[in-house]
A protein has these predicted regions:
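Cleavable N-terminal targeting peptides that direct proteins into the secretory/outer-membrane pathway or into
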Residues: 1-32
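N-terminal periplasmic "start-of-domain" segments of outer-membrane beta-barrel proteins
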Residues: 35-66, 119, 170
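Structured loop/turn residues at beta-strand edges in well-structured enzyme cores
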Residues: 31, 102, 126, 134-137
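Short aromatic-centered micro-motifs
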Residues: 109
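Surface-exposed beta-strand-turn/loop segments characteristic
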Residues: 73, 77-79, 85, 93-94, ...
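Short, polar/charged loop or turn motifs at beta-strand boundaries
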Residues: 51-70, 97-102, 128-129, 176-180, ...
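Short N-terminal segments immediately surrounding and downstream of signal-peptide cleavage
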Residues: 31-43, 287-291, 298-299
């Protein structure tokens, strides 16, 4: 049995010297002192009492009484960690601790005092959701900077998860939860089995966990339904405070149905008055006066058009009410749906009173699904004079200008979903050697592998632009121009041109996913919803 005043694991191939406080009481040679793990301190005391750095500790009893399914939610209740990334506000369902709000990469997360492989692409932050809750004995949070001890990634502090190494028996925990408002059901199954061997000199423990988070959509909560989440924006009232709480926030420069404006250079002119109120349509709204990035008219579900209505404009992008595009939609993901499986196997063995070996292995697989009702953002699409879908009300405008500009934040062109699969593998093996009562040396090898795969739906731009470029064939039926003339260039929007989709003009003759003229292109009617 290894006996010492303090043990602080966490450095591979490094010797850790423990200094005994001068104020400590004298200890007789016959007394055996209990082993104590203290994170971020070289003084062997209760981490909640006295330490050379600020430390907060969460005990096994605290974890059990918290009633939380995810260990990250328990730790995030500490005031210094309230800025942490949890599954509720993560698009991938991952969890990252964030001390003092300075970022997860500046908070060092350890398991048994040893480093853990990152759980995010391009970041050093650890996915805390991969730590087996059933084995957590305590959590120690060093809220002071610990760069001198642990390096630059511990600028804001250290969070150390200490796992049980003496588990014996079988423990099965099944937890389920369902919010009172419905949706978001959660089920977690934890199975832990452990045994001592070799007369108590060794211990082996295996844990298997399965977690199913049902997820919540915006439309499944009254406070978020129908674009109901209020936000703070610039106050349009010059006599009020600079910021105001605004309900029903919208992007007034665009719409879901499709905003229509005269071609470039034609904005603000008096073309038609389709609602017959004596005011030219393009003068009835700020969107009409702006023109090409907004519009004078909007399409109706049946393909007809109406005059654009502004609502209350807040700034150059946001407003409330009117015909602008919603900020949020009922089918958008509010809380992601996540399935997670964790398998953890640890072994420790005391070769002698001064030498102990350990092995920690873990495999985690998590799958997260999110959904957004937005299909894409398409601005300044060109509608040509020979487009057979052109509404009759706008034919006079087309005759004067020569083409129309179409902008749409589409909801009806395809379903936009994303699936994230994350796999984490971690293996740590090492030896702890205690040559004397106040010295400890640890030799360890730590290997971790993190892989993330993401799949999402998107629109194939060459097919989309070709489908938008619709003309009538000899029989008057709508067809793609590329089927009649495979050499024809199709119009693209301004932003595709600016991003190098083509060069020199707002047209492209590049086809990446189909051969023009092969009959694959299906004409798209931009006027009307689900047309």
């Amino acid at each position: 049995m290894i006996k010492s005043l303090s043990r602080k694991p966490g450095f591979a191939l490094a010797a850790l010297a423990v200094a005994v406080a001068t104020a400590a009481p004298t200890v007789s040679a016959q007394e055996e002192l209990e082993e104590v793990i203290v994170t971020g301190s070289r003084i062997p005391v209760d981490s909640n009492a006295v330490s050379s750095v600020p430390i907060q500790a969460i005990s096994e009893e605290d974890i059990r009484n918290a009633g939380e399914i995810n260990i990250a939610d328990i730790v995030a209740d500490i005031p210094a960690l309230v800025s942490s990334l949890t599954a509720e506000n993560s698009s991938t369902g991952a969890n990252a601790l964030n001390l003092r709000g300075l970022g997860g990469s500046r908070t060092l997360t350890l398991v048994n005092g040893r480093r853990h492989v990152a759980g995010f692409r391009g970041s050093q932050a650890v996915d805390v959701g991969s730590i087996p809750r059933a084995l957590v004995k305590s959590v120690e949070v060093t809220t002071g900077g610990a760069s001198a001890v642990y390096g630059a990634d511990a600028v804001t502090g250290v969070v150390n998860f200490i796992l049980r190494d003496d588990f014996e028996g079988l423990q099965v925990d099944l937890s389920t939860g369902r919010p009172e408002r419905g949706a978001g059901e959660t089920t977690v199954l934890d199975i832990a089995w452990g045994t001592n061997f070799a007369g108590g000199r060794g211990n082996a423990v295996l844990t298997v966990s399965a977690e199913d988070d049902g997820g919540i959509l915006y439309g499944e909560r009254s406070w978020s339904r129908n674009n109901g989440i209020a936000t703070t924006l610039n106050n349009p009232d010059p006599n009020g405070p600079p910021r105001a709480v605004v309900n029903d926030p919208r992007y007034w420069l665009t719409s879901h149905e499709g905003s229509i404006a005269p071609g470039f250079g034609g904005r603000g002119n008096t073309y038609v008055d389709i609602n017959g109120n004596g005011i030219a349509d393009c003068q009835e709204s700020e969107g009409g006066r702006v023109g090409y990035l907004a519009g004078c008219w909007l399409t109706n579900p049946d393909g007809s058009v109406r005059v654009n209505q502004d609502g209350v404009l807040i700034d150059g992008l946001f407003g409330t009410g009117g015909d602008g595009a919603y900020a949020d939609h009922n089918s958008d993901t509010l809380y992601p749906e996540t399935d997670r499986q964790v398998v953890n196997f640890n072994v420790s063995y005391e070769f002698s009173d001064t030498l102990r070996g350990f092995l920690e292995t873990k495999y985690v697989k998590a799958e997260t699904n999110t959904f957004s009702e937005y299909d894409g953002f398409f601005d300044t699409l060109e509608i040509t004079p020979d487009n057979p879908y052109l509404p009759a009300e706008l034919q006079p405008v087309m005759d004067q200008v020569g083409y129309l500009i179409f902008t749409k934040d589409a909801l009806d062109w395809h379903e936009d979903g994303s699936e994230y699969t994350r796999e984490t593998t971690r293996v740590v093996a090492g030896l702890e050697w205690q040559p004397s009562e106040d010295h400890m040396v640890e030799f360890s090898v730590n290997q971790g592998i993190f892989e993330q795969k993401s799949e999402s739906t998107s629109i194939l731009l060459d097919r989309f632009y070709a489908a938008m470029d619709t003309v009538a064939d000899a029989n008057g039926n709508p067809v793609c121009r590329s089927d009649l003339d495979p050499t024809a260039a199709y119009p693209i929007d301004y932003f595709a041109w600016a991003n190098g989709y083509t060069e020199g003009s707002f047209y492209s003759d590049r086809y990446y996913t189909f051969t023009p003229g092969d009959g694959q292109c299906q004409p798209l009617n931009p006027f009307g919803t689900y047309a």
